[in-house]
Amino acid sequence: MLSSYSMIRDSWKKLKKSDIYPVQKARMVSWRKSGSVVRLDYPTRLDRARSLGYKAKQGFIIVRSRVRKGGQHRPKIMGGRRPRRLAYNKLTVKKSIQLIAEERAADKYPNMEVLNSYYVGEDGLYKYYEVILIDRSSPAVLSDKNVSWIANSANKGRVYRGLTSAGYKSRGLGHGRLGSAKSRPSIRANGRLRR
Protein backbone atom coordinates (compact mmCIF):
# COMPACT_ATOMS: atom_id res chain seq x y z
CA MET A 1 0.00 0.00 0.00
CA LEU A 2 1.31 3.45 -0.94
CA SER A 3 2.05 6.06 1.69
CA SER A 4 0.18 9.36 1.63
CA TYR A 5 3.28 11.18 0.37
CA SER A 6 3.66 8.69 -2.49
CA MET A 7 0.03 9.20 -3.46
CA ILE A 8 0.48 13.00 -3.50
CA ARG A 9 3.63 12.63 -5.61
CA ASP A 10 1.95 10.29 -8.10
CA SER A 11 -1.04 12.59 -8.52
CA TRP A 12 1.31 15.50 -9.37
CA LYS A 13 3.31 13.36 -11.81
CA LYS A 14 0.16 12.53 -13.82
CA LEU A 15 -1.69 15.75 -13.13
CA LYS A 16 -4.15 15.72 -16.05
CA LYS A 17 -5.32 12.19 -15.20
CA SER A 18 -5.49 12.73 -11.44
CA ASP A 19 -8.37 13.82 -9.20
CA ILE A 20 -6.69 17.12 -8.31
CA TYR A 21 -6.72 18.45 -11.90
CA PRO A 22 -10.08 20.32 -11.59
CA VAL A 23 -8.87 21.81 -8.30
CA GLN A 24 -5.62 22.89 -9.94
CA LYS A 25 -7.48 24.61 -12.80
CA ALA A 26 -9.58 26.56 -10.29
CA ARG A 27 -6.39 27.50 -8.43
CA MET A 28 -4.88 28.98 -11.60
CA VAL A 29 -7.82 31.38 -11.94
CA SER A 30 -7.53 32.61 -8.35
CA TRP A 31 -3.72 32.71 -8.39
CA ARG A 32 -3.65 35.01 -11.41
CA LYS A 33 -5.87 37.50 -9.55
CA SER A 34 -3.66 37.44 -6.44
CA GLY A 35 -0.35 39.25 -5.92
CA SER A 36 3.01 38.23 -7.36
CA VAL A 37 4.46 37.15 -3.98
CA VAL A 38 1.91 35.71 -1.52
CA ARG A 39 2.57 34.11 1.87
CA LEU A 40 0.78 30.77 2.40
CA ASP A 41 -0.39 28.94 5.51
CA TYR A 42 0.70 25.52 4.25
CA PRO A 43 2.41 24.08 1.13
CA THR A 44 0.40 23.07 -1.93
CA ARG A 45 2.71 20.09 -2.56
CA LEU A 46 3.46 18.73 0.89
CA ASP A 47 5.58 15.83 -0.39
CA ARG A 48 7.86 18.14 -2.39
CA ALA A 49 8.16 20.72 0.38
CA ARG A 50 9.11 18.09 2.97
CA SER A 51 11.67 16.48 0.66
CA LEU A 52 13.34 19.89 0.17
CA GLY A 53 13.63 20.57 3.91
CA TYR A 54 10.36 22.24 4.94
CA LYS A 55 9.20 21.69 8.52
CA ALA A 56 5.89 22.83 10.02
CA LYS A 57 7.53 24.75 12.85
CA GLN A 58 8.39 28.29 13.89
CA GLY A 59 10.88 30.02 11.60
CA PHE A 60 9.71 28.35 8.37
CA ILE A 61 7.31 29.98 5.91
CA ILE A 62 6.05 29.15 2.41
CA VAL A 63 5.63 31.85 -0.23
CA ARG A 64 4.07 31.49 -3.68
CA SER A 65 5.98 33.49 -6.28
CA ARG A 66 4.63 34.34 -9.74
CA VAL A 67 6.97 34.91 -12.70
CA ARG A 68 6.37 35.56 -16.39
CA LYS A 69 6.72 32.75 -18.91
CA GLY A 70 8.89 32.75 -22.00
CA GLY A 71 11.55 35.21 -23.14
CA GLN A 72 12.23 38.62 -21.70
CA HIS A 73 11.33 42.00 -23.23
CA ARG A 74 13.15 45.21 -22.51
CA PRO A 75 11.02 48.31 -21.79
CA LYS A 76 9.38 49.76 -24.88
CA ILE A 77 11.69 51.89 -27.03
CA MET A 78 10.60 55.50 -27.30
CA GLY A 79 12.04 57.69 -30.06
CA GLY A 80 13.30 57.13 -33.58
CA ARG A 81 15.71 54.26 -34.02
CA ARG A 82 15.79 50.71 -35.25
CA PRO A 83 14.48 48.30 -32.62
CA ARG A 84 16.60 45.57 -34.18
CA ARG A 85 19.76 47.26 -32.91
CA LEU A 86 18.54 47.53 -29.32
CA ALA A 87 17.69 43.86 -28.67
CA TYR A 88 14.10 44.54 -27.64
CA ASN A 89 12.74 41.03 -28.29
CA LYS A 90 14.00 37.50 -27.77
CA LEU A 91 16.26 38.21 -24.81
CA THR A 92 17.48 35.06 -23.09
CA VAL A 93 18.33 35.76 -19.48
CA LYS A 94 21.19 33.86 -17.86
CA LYS A 95 19.06 33.06 -14.81
CA SER A 96 16.33 30.45 -14.75
CA ILE A 97 12.76 31.59 -14.12
CA GLN A 98 12.76 29.56 -10.89
CA LEU A 99 15.79 31.51 -9.63
CA ILE A 100 14.05 34.80 -10.45
CA ALA A 101 11.03 33.60 -8.42
CA GLU A 102 13.31 32.81 -5.45
CA GLU A 103 14.98 36.23 -5.63
CA ARG A 104 11.63 38.04 -5.65
CA ALA A 105 10.49 36.10 -2.59
CA ALA A 106 13.77 36.98 -0.83
CA ASP A 107 13.28 40.68 -1.71
CA LYS A 108 9.85 40.64 -0.04
CA TYR A 109 11.19 39.00 3.16
CA PRO A 110 14.68 40.47 3.75
CA ASN A 111 15.11 38.92 7.22
CA MET A 112 14.76 35.39 5.82
CA GLU A 113 16.91 33.08 3.71
CA VAL A 114 15.72 30.96 0.78
CA LEU A 115 16.14 27.25 1.47
CA ASN A 116 14.70 25.89 -1.78
CA SER A 117 11.73 26.09 -4.14
CA TYR A 118 9.54 23.90 -6.32
CA TYR A 119 7.10 24.21 -9.24
CA VAL A 120 3.35 24.35 -8.53
CA GLY A 121 1.77 25.27 -11.86
CA GLU A 122 1.50 27.54 -14.86
CA ASP A 123 -1.13 29.20 -17.00
CA GLY A 124 -0.90 31.05 -20.31
CA LEU A 125 1.00 34.02 -18.85
CA TYR A 126 2.77 32.97 -15.67
CA LYS A 127 4.67 30.21 -13.90
CA TYR A 128 4.15 29.68 -10.18
CA TYR A 129 6.73 28.44 -7.69
CA GLU A 130 6.52 27.93 -3.95
CA VAL A 131 9.62 29.11 -2.09
CA ILE A 132 10.66 27.81 1.34
CA LEU A 133 12.04 30.64 3.50
CA ILE A 134 13.75 30.32 6.89
CA ASP A 135 14.12 32.97 9.58
CA ARG A 136 17.84 32.81 10.36
CA SER A 137 17.43 34.38 13.84
CA SER A 138 14.55 32.19 15.06
CA PRO A 139 15.37 30.18 18.24
CA ALA A 140 13.59 27.13 16.78
CA VAL A 141 15.87 27.25 13.72
CA LEU A 142 19.06 27.86 15.73
CA SER A 143 18.35 24.85 17.96
CA ASP A 144 17.63 22.51 15.01
CA LYS A 145 20.86 20.79 13.99
CA ASN A 146 19.55 20.06 10.48
CA VAL A 147 18.95 23.69 9.48
CA SER A 148 21.03 25.78 11.91
CA TRP A 149 23.75 26.04 9.23
CA ILE A 150 21.61 28.65 7.45
CA ALA A 151 22.23 31.12 10.32
CA ASN A 152 25.95 31.11 9.50
CA SER A 153 27.11 34.44 8.04
CA ALA A 154 28.54 32.61 5.00
CA ASN A 155 24.97 31.75 3.96
CA LYS A 156 23.62 35.29 4.15
CA GLY A 157 22.01 36.31 0.85
CA ARG A 158 22.65 32.84 -0.60
CA VAL A 159 19.92 33.18 -3.27
CA TYR A 160 21.61 36.27 -4.76
CA ARG A 161 24.93 34.40 -5.06
CA GLY A 162 23.47 31.38 -6.85
CA LEU A 163 23.82 28.99 -3.90
CA THR A 164 20.32 27.46 -4.02
CA SER A 165 19.54 24.42 -6.17
CA ALA A 166 18.08 26.60 -8.94
CA GLY A 167 21.16 28.84 -8.75
CA TYR A 168 23.54 25.90 -9.06
CA LYS A 169 21.67 24.66 -12.11
CA SER A 170 21.78 28.10 -13.78
CA ARG A 171 25.53 28.28 -13.20
CA GLY A 172 26.07 24.92 -14.89
CA LEU A 173 27.11 23.16 -11.69
CA GLY A 174 25.86 20.15 -9.80
CA HIS A 175 26.91 17.29 -12.07
CA GLY A 176 30.59 16.82 -11.23
CA ARG A 177 33.52 17.86 -13.40
CA LEU A 178 32.33 16.62 -16.78
CA GLY A 179 30.69 19.36 -18.83
CA SER A 180 31.34 22.11 -16.30
CA ALA A 181 34.98 23.00 -17.02
CA LYS A 182 34.15 26.60 -17.95
CA SER A 183 31.78 27.05 -15.00
CA ARG A 184 34.52 27.23 -12.36
CA PRO A 185 35.48 29.28 -10.39
CA SER A 186 32.51 31.08 -11.97
CA ILE A 187 31.38 31.73 -15.53
CA ARG A 188 32.45 35.37 -15.32
CA ALA A 189 35.81 34.65 -13.69
CA ASN A 190 36.55 31.91 -16.19
CA GLY A 191 35.95 34.36 -19.03
CA ARG A 192 38.49 36.73 -17.48
CA LEU A 193 41.05 33.96 -17.13
CA ARG A 194 40.81 32.98 -20.81
CA ARG A 195 41.46 36.51 -22.17
UniProtKB/Swiss-Prot annotation:
InterPro entries reported for this sequence: Rbsml_eL15_core_dom_sf, Ribosomal_eL15, Ribosomal_eL15_arc, Ribosomal_eL15_CS, Ribosomal_uL23/eL15/eS24_sf
Region (Disordered): 174-195
Record GO biological process: cytoplasmic translation
Keyword Ribosomal protein part of the UniProt annotation: yes
Pfam family, one: Ribosomal_L15e
PROSITE patterns: RIBOSOMAL_L15E
GO molecular function: RNA binding; structural constituent of ribosome
Disulfide partners: none
Entry's Gene Ontology cellular component terms: cytosolic large ribosomal subunit
Key words of the record: Ribonucleoprotein, Ribosomal protein
UniProt family annotation: Belongs to the eukaryotic ribosomal protein eL15 family.
HAMAP family: Ribosomal_eL15
NCBIfam families per record: PRK04243.1
The protein, known as: Large ribosomal subunit protein eL15
Lineage, opening ranks: Archaea, Methanobacteriati, Thermoplasmatota, Thermoplasmata, Thermoplasmatales
